[in-house]
Structure formats: C-alpha cells, structure tokens
C-alpha cells in the first residue's frame, strides 16, 4: 500500500482543521444551550399588576397620578442582545422609559440592535394598566435563533422604578415551553435618586447600576418600599406566557386593546396584607414650666403622626408627654 504524499496529508489535515473550526463556531458560548425546536412558536403574554394598597400600604399613590403601570415593551432576541440586566448600567433609551415612560429612544435602540447584529427577531407591546391591579396582554413570536424574551414595565408614579424580565428562554432543548410564569419585583434603574413614589427629579450622578428594591434596601425609612418587618416584599406583579397552538405564519403585531375595568383584580382573599407600623416625629422641645411658685409645676412636649398604621401594624404611641418641673421666674 502506497504512503500518502506530503501534499495529500497536508490537504487532509487542513480539511480536518476546517471541519473542527466550523463545528466549534456552531457551538454555544459560555454554556449557552442550543435550541433545536421547531422554527417558530407564538405565545400570549399576560402582565398582571398586584400593586394594591393592602399589599403595599406605605405611601400608596391615590391621586396625581394614582398607582398604575406604563405600557409593556419587550423583544424576542438572541443572547447577543440585552435590554436590561441586574448590576449593569441601563441604556439612554431604558433610562427615558424608566423615568418618564417614553419608549421612542428604547424602540430605536432595539431596532438598531436588530439591524446591526441580527439579534432581535420581533418587538412586542401591550397597553398600559390604569390602576395598580389589573391586566394587559399581547402576542409575541420567537424562533430558534431568537428564543429569549425580555420586557419592561414602568411603575407609575416613581423616580425610575420598573419591573420586567431579562432574557427568559422559551426554548427547552428540542421543544418550546408550553408555559412560563414569573413573579415580578421592583427594580431601580440607577438614574434617579428619588426615595418615594412622588419624589421630584433628582438625577443620580454618576449613574448607578440596576438594583433590586427590597423590603430593607434601600435601608432608609423614607423609601416607599421600606418594610423592616418583612423578610421579602410580596410580588408587585406577575407575568404569564402561554404557547398558542397555531400554525407558524408571518407575525403580525396585535392591535392594542385598552384594558377595561373588567380586568381589575378584585379577589382580595389572595392579596397579602402587609403590616404598616405607625411612624411618629421626634419630640418637640419642652414647653414652659407652669405652676405656682414654691410648688412643683408641669411642662409638656408633643410629637405628631407621620404614617398612620395599617393592616394590623404597630399602633401609634402617646403623642404628648408631661414632666414635673420647677416654675421659672417666680416673684
């Protein structure tokens, strides 16, 4: 048997190297799984607001404006795109959305990412919810190369607070998930330093990263979500995605349908009652000592209620205190 020539051996080696390179290029990076499901899948997405005065009694917005949710804005994308991520800085577009609910710049950023990197398959949106408790929904489409879903909804009113999902994968190996449901909690976009729902605009300089707001962080009594008696906040919203049984076809964005009062959640049995303790001011200075000369008199000081208790929270303490004293300026 003839030995292969050096040229033939080199050709085989180059061929093997090329095949290995192509194979490596097709592998996911960073442990990312490969989606081999059917090319397309369509889902309904339902956002449910759970921001009630019972679950979140502290500083609950009742007017100008009352508690509500902005429109939902999301995208089906690949791992090359990120709409937002915890512990990272938000883009200018997401800053505008989180602070003012303006979606134009964020839409342009998503569009640019889709054109430059082919990383976005489709954009979807759902109408705003005009109250803290209510629902809104839309439809979206994903495909093998764009199986991740991200979205944001602004908390209204708030400095720069929002809820959302970052890169939820609807593909599970060779099949699409039938459904997915997640509880949602508030996040701070890191662009405004306001502590309360109705805080005036106060830009964070330098800009901070996205952080989750918890019952103890920020650790300040003025914060609207500060509930030191709770280990964790109850979910402020929930999202549910359900796969639709329809034959794949060209995706047509759904026409927006404004939510009606029929969508409001009225089942109070499932709403957690978050206790809100009474908060009072510091004591005032002692008043003048009153009484007759040669005898002990009394003086008093007062304080006032800053936050009324709710949902079996700790009651308010005494608001006036007296103490014995020696009258001044006796003649």
Swiss-Prot record:
Changing residue 42 to A: Strongly reduced metal-dependent interaction with integrin. A divalent metal cation binds at residue 141. Keywords: Calcium, Cell adhesion, Disulfide bond, Extracellular matrix, Glycoprotein, Immunity, Innate immunity, Metal-binding, Secreted, Signal. Expressed in normal lung tissue but not in lung carcinoma cell lines. Disulfide bonds join 35-171. GO terms for molecular function: antigen binding; lipopolysaccharide binding; metal ion binding. One of its GO terms (cellular component) is extracellular exosome. Gene3D superfamilies: F-spondin domain (2.60.40.2130), Thrombospondin type-1 (TSP1) repeat (2.20.100.10). Monomer. Interacts with integrin. One of its GO terms (biological process) is positive regulation of macrophage cytokine production. The record marks 141 as: Important for metal ion-dependent interaction with integrin. Cell adhesion protein that promotes adhesion and outgrowth of hippocampal embryonic neurons. Binds directly to bacteria and their components and functions as an opsonin for macrophage phagocytosis of bacteria. Essential in the initiation of the innate immune response and represents a unique pattern-recognition molecule in the ECM for microbial pathogens. Binds bacterial lipopolysaccharide (LPS). InterPro entries: Spondin/Thrombospondin_T1 (IPR051418), Spondin_N (IPR009465), Spondin_N_sf (IPR038678), TSP1_rpt (IPR000884), TSP1_rpt_sf (IPR036383), TSP1_spondin_dom (IPR044004). SUPFAM superfamilies: TSP-1 type 1 repeat (SSF82895). Glycans are attached at residue 283. This is Spondin-2. It is found in: Secreted, Extracellular space, Extracellular matrix. Ca(2+) binds at residues 160, 188, 192.
């Amino acid at each position: 048997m003839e030995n292969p020539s050096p040229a033939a051996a080199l050709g085989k080696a180059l061929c093997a190297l090329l095949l290995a390179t192509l194979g490596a290029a097709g592998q996911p990076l960073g442990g990312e799984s490969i989606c081999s499901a059917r090319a397309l899948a369509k889902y309904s997405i339902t956002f449910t607001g759970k921001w009630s005065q019972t679950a979140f009694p502290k500083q609950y917005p009742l007017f100008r404006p009352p508690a509500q949710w902005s429109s939902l804005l999301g995208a089906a994308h690949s791992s090359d795109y990120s709409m937002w991520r915890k512990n990272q800085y938000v883009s200018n577009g997401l800053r505008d959305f989180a602070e003012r609910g303006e979606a134009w710049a964020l839409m342009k950023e998503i569009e640019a990412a889709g054109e430059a990197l082919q990383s976005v398959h489709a954009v979807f949106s759902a109408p705003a919810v005009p109250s803290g408790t209510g629902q809104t929904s839309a439809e979206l489409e994903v495909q093998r190369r764009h199986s991740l879903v991200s979205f944001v909804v602004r908390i209204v009113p708030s400095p720069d607070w929002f809820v959302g999902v970052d890169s939820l994968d609807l593909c599970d190996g060779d099949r699409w998930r039938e459904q997915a449901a997640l509880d949602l909690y508030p996040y701070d976009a890191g662009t405004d330093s306001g502590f309360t729902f109705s805080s005036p605009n106060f830009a964070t300089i330098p800009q901070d990263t996205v952080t989750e707001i918890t019952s103890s962080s920020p650790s300040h009594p003025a914060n609207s979500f500060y509930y030191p008696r709770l280990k964790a906040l109850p979910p402020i919203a929930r999202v549910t995605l359900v796969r639709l049984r329809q034959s794949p076809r060209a995706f047509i964005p759904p026409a927006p349908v404004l939510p009606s009062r029929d969508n409001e959640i009225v089942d109070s049995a499932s709403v957690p009652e978050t206790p809100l303790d009474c908060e009072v001011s510091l004591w005032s200075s002692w008043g003048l000592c009153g009484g007759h000369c040669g005898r002990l008199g009394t003086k008093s000081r007062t304080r006032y209620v800053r936050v009324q208790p709710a949902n079996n929270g700790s009651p308010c303490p005494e608001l006036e205190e007296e103490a014995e004293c020696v009258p001044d300026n006796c003649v």
